[in-house]
Curated annotation (Swiss-Prot):
Keyword Amino-acid biosynthesis among UniProt keywords: no
Entry's localization field: Cytoplasm
Entry GO terms, CC: cytoplasm
Entry GO MF terms: LPPG:FO 2-phospho-L-lactate transferase activity
Family affiliation: Belongs to the gluconeogenesis factor family.
Pfam families linked to this entry: CofD
Annotated signal sequence range: none
Assigned keywords, A-Z: Cytoplasm
The keyword Nuclease is annotated on this UniProt entry: no
Biological role stated in the UniProt entry: Required for morphogenesis under gluconeogenic growth conditions.
Annotated InterPro entries: CofD (IPR002882), CofD-like_dom_sf (IPR038136), Gluconeogen_factor (IPR010119)
Organism: Clostridium acetobutylicum (strain ATCC 824 / DSM 792 / JCM 1419 / IAM 19013 / LMG 5710 / NBRC 13948 / NRRL B-527 / VKM B-1787 / 2291 / W)
Name listed for the protein in its UniProt record: Putative gluconeogenesis factor
């Protein structure tokens, strides 16, 4: 490892290196004097130089022990695991030290979109708090919710895995779904979290324990510990109950969603979540189903108020495609207006929108399911005072349009740097570190494309 790597700002070793150098200087000077001129000195001079050697040795001891403590503290806190890969120790320390000091980001949502985004963000900061919806009542999560009375674990499991630092085999195991018997279509990860809930005092503790086992970067929190039920009032006046039923009934009645609400309406947010929003550099809403994954979180008591009061940069990641039964014919401004309406005030400063396109074949496939690319209506967004950040976020996976986790993370980090960190002098080290990291990732991308 190069010497320059040890003296980079933020690694907290430079001070001990300098102190150690001072100790070596004291010892060297005293020894040189005693060896070359010792016979000419009386006992008092000799005692002085011996004293210098003792002081130098003490200083050297302090510098070595404190320097090692600085390294070991990273390992003990779980920020550094030298066995994870073959990168050099100094580079790992520098990277982990700055990730710990990276921008404080709160990501609010649920479903596949949120976990996809988290996979990209964890490479830029470890100060991530993922706030996840607990209104899911379908699939394996719904079955466990009904049978065991626990909060739905599916979305939380996906976010934990997205932020975890585990072997691929462990991730495959936790994502495995049983194919037969009474557990058919049930995820092992859901069962793992349900078992963890059984040995914990509450669901929040169970999530913390699972996060600890899987070495999660940041935190994953349920938006509330209350057993909430999601309801929707359609424009025709019909009230639909259940997250999984809402889009289906909207399609059946051919009536769009007018309003979303939760019961109990006084469900309380975790104090830790509210505090994270208050202290955040940026709060990200989405991506995810607007009415069933994003907005339900904002209806929980204290979350909406915290968003209105926070000084954090507030970003909304718009969906790429409209969703049948939820956002039919919606433009980007329609998404933002729906959020504003339900919170009761403006909570979006900038919205990230996709300007990429898909093949005609894929457009036709989605059109047959009454879905299309979300329209970017810049004029309407200007009218409501919401900035636009554009990028090509499309990634085709298994024939479906998905967000590209790496690309969306880069754009988000660049936006946070330019709109928030650039004006905060205390974050200057993180700003330059993130700039360097982004450049490295861009360079790596070009090399991969060239190959």
């Amino acid at each position: 490892m190069k010497f320059i790597d040890w003296i980079k700002p933020g690694i907290k070793l430079k001070r001990w290196i300098m102190l150690g150098g001072m100790g070596v200087l004291f010892i060297s000077f005293a020894l040189a004097e005693l060896i070359t001129k010792g016979s000419y000195y009386n006992v008092y001079y000799k005692a002085f130089y011996i004293f210098l050697i003792v002081v130098g040795a003490f200083i050297l001891y302090i510098s070595l022990t404190q320097g090692m403590k600085s390294i070991i503290s990273l390992i003990n806190k779980g920020y550094l695991n030298v066995s994870l890969d073959s990168r050099k120790l100094g580079n790992l320390i520098y990277e982990k030290r700055l990730l710990v000091k990276g921008p404080k980001i709160v990501a609010i949502g649920g479903g596949t979109g949120l976990s996809t985004m988290l996979r990209g963000l964890k490479y830029y900061t470890s100060n991530i708090t993922a706030v996840v919806t607990v209104a899911d009542d379908g699939g394996g999560s719904g079955a466990l919710r009904e049978d065991l009375g626990i909060l739905p674990p599916g979305d939380i499991r996906n976010c934990i895995l997205a932020l975890s630092d585990t072997e691929p085999l462990m991730e495959d195991l936790l994502q495995y779904r049983f194919k037969d018997g009474r557990l058919k279509n049930q995820s092992f990860g859901n069962l793992f979290l349900a078992a963890m809930d059984g040995i914990s005092t509450n669901f929040e503790e169970a999530v913390h324990k699972m996060s600890s086992v899987l070495a999660v970067t940041g935190k994953v929190l349920p938006v509330t510990l209350d057993n909430v039920v999601l309801k929707a009032k359609l424009k025709n006046g019909v009230v639909v109950e259940g997250e999984s039923n809402i889009p289906e009934q909207a399609i059946l009645y051919e009536s769009p969603i007018e309003k979303i609400f939760i019961e109990p309406e006084n469900a309380r947010a975790l104090h830790e979540t509210v505090q994270a929003i208050k202290e955040a550099d940026a709060v990200i809403l989405g991506p995810g189903s607007l009415f069933t994954s994003v907005i339900p979180n904002l209806l929980v008591k204290d979350i909406g108020n915290a968003l209105l009061k926070t000084k954090a940069l507030k970003l909304y990641v718009s969906n790429i495609m409209t969703q049948p039964g939820e956002t039919d014919n919606f433009s980007v401004s329609d998404h933002v207006n729906a959020i504003t309406k339900h919170v009761g005030g403006k909570v979006v400063d900038y919205t990230l929108v996709n300007n990429g396109t898909v093949s005609e074949k894929l457009k036709k496939k989605y059109f047959e399911k009454t879905s299309e690319l979300v329209k970017i209506d810049k004029n309407e967004l200007d009218k409501i005072g919401v900035g636009i950040v554009e990028g090509n976020f499309i990634k085709i996976k298994d024939g479906f349009v998905r967000h590209d986790s790496d690309e969306i993370a880069k754009i988000l980090v660049e936006t946070i740097m330019d709109k928030k960190l650039f004006y905060d002098r205390k974050k200057i080290i993180e700003y330059f570190y993130l700039s360097q990291r982004l450049k490295e990732n861009r360079k790596l991308e070009k090399e991969n494309r060239g190959n």
